[in-house]
Each structure stands twice: as structure tokens, then as C-alpha cells.
Curated annotation (Swiss-Prot):
Protein's name in the database: Large ribosomal subunit protein bL27c
Main location: plastid
SS bond list: none
Organism, scientific name: Chrysochromulina alifera
Domain of life: Eukaryota
GO cellular component, one term: ribonucleoprotein complex
Pfam families named in the record: Ribosomal_L27 (PF01016)
Family statement: Belongs to the bacterial ribosomal protein bL27 family.
Compartment(s) where it occurs, according to its Swiss-Prot or TrEMBL record: Plastid, Chloroplast
PROSITE patterns membership: RIBOSOMAL_L27 (PS00831)
GO biological process, one term: translation
UniProt GO molecular function: structural constituent of ribosome
Keywords of the record: Chloroplast, Plastid, Ribonucleoprotein, Ribosomal protein
Amino acid sequence: STKNGRDSNSKRLGVKVYGNQPAKAGSIIVRQRGLTFKPGKGVSVGKDYTIFATQNGIVQFESDKKEKIISVY
């Protein structure tokens, strides 16, 4: 028998709502490990670094020199 053959379940991370798409309050925009995307206006961060909308609006991805910021307007 082999000692290999194990793998963890995928965690389904990544962007769930893309730029210029509508988001309702409470809807998840990004699932991430660590703050790859930083929160802007109209969004908040959960304890597992999930970024979610706090208001209804359109998702906008903005980038400074280093930071990627997500906002909902």
C-alpha cells in the first residue's frame, strides 16, 4: 500500500462578485486568507478576512500603488 494519496478539501476561496456587478447588503464579495484585498467604503471584513457588502450597490475594485481596495457604491 502507498503512503501518499491524501489531499485537503478545496476551500472555495476567491472573488465571488466582480467589478461593476450589483451586490446586496450582507453578500460576500471575496473569500480570502489574509487581507489580500482591503476594505473600502460600503464593505466590512469578517473574522476569516471575508469581505462582504454592508450596503446595496455596485462593486468597485480600486488599486493604489500596492493595495487592492474593494468598495460598494
